[in-house]
């Protein structure tokens, strides 16, 4: 399994890969993860939860990616020890890994986590075109491409030429059940008792559309003056200073937004979701934000932009409301609607878990990988 970042780096993509790798290892398979040595305090090689992790030096960072000059040599050595290769994209060297796998007589599964969509600046657009070209080559040499939903694949310019290779498998999402006593205490500690609370989470980057939420907040407050908002995530993203660009929108809302920072502890994250009355996903583009499933499993309905991929969770469960994308008024209307009649949108935990079952996802990948290895 190859990907740019792996544990302890934490994004939806790395969480997905970690759950899948460890799930396959628990089923008795030998799993090796090849990833960048992005943090030199980590060991170059280690076993973690049954998974062998091999980290490759990455002396150059290219926007969100890591350039790994010796990756080819590492993959060439390891590929013959394994029956099939999986690559999680976006990853600059996917095409190289695919070529080396084929040279060794192995097949490559490319797991696509979303088209690369960068801000409009010349450098970001250069990166998008460069990486896009490399990913086009990768898709062409992939034997199978897995994606989180067929909806996203059908609307992806990048995947459309390769739909005959695409298999849709829901991501393996896991999160503890919320601690209700801790939720009540945390609300009180933050001074949020009695307030309607809207949660949002993730990297504060342009594609997440948080600027539309900032524009929607005053519109919500006109109709629900006591409403509060809570953000779980890192606003200061190294490769994209979008939060700083949004300060004119954020400053008027500052008194209504509680900044919680990046929450790494999974129990605390579950408590965050449960603390919120509604969870908001205002993305411009998003393949399949796993935060949506986490929120639903913690009993919190969604208000989500009606875009390919992201809308699949609401469509599959009915636990939330879809609103027009890139439209702060539609977003505000949706938030007020769900906050005003929250119980109408809440579904039983068992229904959500039956739809998004991590064991079923790992089993589906196991069957797919075994078919490719045979």
What label would you give each PLM region?
Residues 192-208, 214-217, 230:
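Conserved donor-binding/catalytic core segment of Leloir-type glycosyltransferases
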Residues 70, 107, 117-137, 154, ...:
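Nucleotide-sugar donor phosphate/pyrophosphate-binding loop at the beta->alpha transition
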Residues 243-263:
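Nucleotide-activated donor-binding/catalytic signature segment of Leloir-type glycosyltransferases, i.e.
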Residues 90, 284:
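Aromatic "clamp/platform" in nucleotide-sugar-dependent glycosyltransferases that forms part
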Residues 316-317, 321-328, 336-342:
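Conserved acidic donor-binding segment of nucleotide-sugar-dependent glycosyltransferases
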Residues 132, 136-177:
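A short, active-site helix/loop in glycosyltransferases that binds the activated sugar's phosphate group
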Residues 79, 270-276:
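Short alpha-helical donor nucleotide-sugar binding micro-motif in glycosyltransferases
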Residues 301-304:
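Short hydrophobic beta-strand element within catalytic cores of glycosyltransferases
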